Amino acid sequence: YTTKDGRTVCFRPDLNASRIADSCRGLQIPVVPEEMFLRAVKEVVKANEAWVPPFGSGATLYIRPYVFGVNPVIGVKPADEYEFRMFCTPVGPYFKGGAKPITIRVSDVDRAAPHGTGNIKAGLNYAMSLHNIVDAHEHGFDENMYLDPATRTKVEETGGANFLFVTKDGTVVTPKSDSILPSITRRSLMVVAEKYLGLKVEQREVYFDEVKDFAECGLCGTAAVISPVGKI
């Protein structure tokens, strides 16, 4: 991001370093050291600083770190050699309408398995939602709401963002599940809501039946930032 006074800043790179380390452990990949990750962020941003969108544009420089196996392995087993790479690109609003409220449908497809890899930032989790998001767009929806795969009664997340709900008494509620990706944006928003805005916050199981009783709903994530939901 570019700040009002012209500085270039990154959003919580330390927590992103911790999350990629956790994901590596879950996928049997050697952990990317935090110092290496943070150095890469600084070098990539510095090399592409001319592409950081100006303050007030609503756009950002999106940074994508990734790790993948590179040696030839036929069997179902971890690779022996991996590469850690990082690239960046300027991006505008995640949804085409910008801050315009989006429309979401409840999906009949599962994004992740119970006690599986849903809490790991792995490419396979996004692959699981590709056909479903294309189908949603073809039917006039912006995103899918995924329910828990075990009982299909509780709200989890979308294919690329976490949910935030606000009750009629002003409490900020976010779903809790072991198959939801731990969102750094969501975590930060909950701290801001509680510590700086004085709001009551709850991270708990959210049943789909109670969604109709919330006063507000939104999505949050690295790309989505904060996107209002107008209809489910």
For each feature predicted by the language model, list its residue ranges.
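Short, flexible micro-motifs
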Residues: 162, 186, 224
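Glycine- and Gly-Pro-enriched alpha-helical subdomains that act as flexible
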Residues: 145, 150-177, 182
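Conserved alpha/beta cores of soluble small-molecule-handling proteins
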Residues: 1-144, 150-154, 191-232
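Feature captures the catalytic cores and cofactor-binding loops of soluble hydro-lyases/lyases
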Residues: 183-190
